[in-house]
Amino acid sequence: MILTKEQEEIINSDKLSFKINAVAGSGKTTTLLEYAKKNSHLKILYLAYNKSLQTSLLDKLKKYNLPSMHISTIHSLAYNKIEAYNYTLAHDLKNQIIENVITKHELTVNQKAYYPIPEYVALIKDLVNFYCNSSLIALDSKLIESYKKQSELGAKILELINKNETRVIEHLKTILSAMKNKVIDATHDFYLKMFYLNKKVSTNLPYDLILVDEAQDISDVMIGIVENQSCRRIYVGDSFQQIYTFRFATNALNKIDLPSYDLTQSFRFGDNYAKVLQNNLNSLYEINSSKPLKISGLEKTTLIGKNHIDFNKQFCVIARSTFGLIQQLVYFIHDKKKVYFEGGYNSYSFMNQTVYSIFYLKQKKNDKITIDEIKDFDTINELEQFAKDTKNQDYLNIIKFINTYGDNIFEINKKIKEFLVTDKKDADIIFTTTHKSKGLEYDQVIMADDFISKKEITNTKNKLSYLRVNEELNIYYVAATRAKDVIQLADLNLSYTYNENDETTSYVKSRFISKRADNKKSKELQEEWLKKNRVKKLI
């Protein structure tokens, strides 16, 4: 196997613990496995980011003779150690359950009737997730302050916290106790937190070396578990692929003070493209005072531009948001090509009970609403305001989908299912969002037009935070590094000069601003777009 100098330096390192910043497609897994092979006398734990990556690693491990290496996700490790199989588990806490627990607590403990508003329930749910992903132990005002600093909260949610801090902490304790005592289902992050808190179980794991993959997207509680060990540690990740801060992920590569190595050459695409991408993104990272990207590629040519896409061969469409993906779907579905969805069609919020319920809410057919949380709202406008206040992007995407296409959504769903295939090899077009494409690669890629650009970054009237801009640029980078041979890049508008009277910043208006457009103008824009994208007239 031919290795780069960067890879050889890591494999031959005499440092006991260190971190590796590896660009997309730079062979980080191969590097780690080669390092493990050279240190096969050690008992090694390889922490994979998720189950699918664990399966992929187990397949790669067959080529290596490493009987002393164990591959696991950190949740699987915690599940067995903490005996989480004794709990009934759920991937997510339902708002209705939180509301019921709080109402019952107030009635039995404080002897008063109390019915929390939806925004308050959403706040408690978010706080539970924050606590379970943090390394903090105490449930106190320090936790609340930390939550406020790490979350971009709207004015209404901030007001709820500031006016009700004591009650918020009390209800947070109530929900956590209900999970611990098996009154309600426990989340997977909850038993991970329980594992972290139980130092007798979570410290001194029986390994000489722990390899932590995707270190840019792990949580503080995961970092805490690894750092509590007395063995050697190696963290590997890509700082430019940190795209999960909304799940309270932390970039361990920036947080952990260890000797550092870099893998800057990608084996995925040509060096010509690597330099274009590096220069384009760095011009925007620089505006945001972010760390510059350094990346190189292979001695091959990767073609840039839609005119190079061969539509007779398989290609992949990557969008920033679910709604952006729907727009691309509507455009391509008329070509009668076979389509495939990364992660499965059902994992996208196109047509499910939530979409149906919101559609019927708009139609004022409340008797047909099946989702309890949506029953709390009288109109779709109320739900939209709630989604903006709580930054519920899933609801906002669905509302935009319904407002744009009306009852066309049923026809769109029917068309998709007509051409849907379940085997990727059979597809003419692969559809995915950036987050679902992470870790994957394609011969040909088309990026949708819903990514951030210079227009939004330089907009001082509706200024985005440093963290938001950095993550949005990272999301662009992840999508842009999926292609091997040909790519149509989303326009970064690099020549744009900010004008405070410019109203063309559609990305900001659609994703970050709560100001409602004039209904008549909005309707005209929708009609124009539908006509352009070959959809029947909006009803």
Regions found by a protein language model. Name each.
Residues 86-177, 366-386:
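ATP-hydrolysis module of ASCE/P-loop NTPase motor domains
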Residues 1-87, 278, 481:
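P-loop NTPase Walker
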Residues 307-430, 434:
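Conserved helicase/translocase motor-coupling segment
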Residues 133-202, 392, 396-424:
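Conserved helicase NTPase catalytic core signature
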Residues 2-12, 17-19, 165-250, 439:
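Conserved helicase NTPase motor core
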Residues 51-130, 335-336, 341-346:
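Conserved P-loop NTPase-based nucleic-acid remodeling module centered on helicase motor cores
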Residues 21-26, 30, 34, 38, ...:
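Conserved helicase motor core of SF1/SF2 NTP-dependent helicases
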Residues 399-432, 438-444, 449-526:
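C-terminal accessory regions
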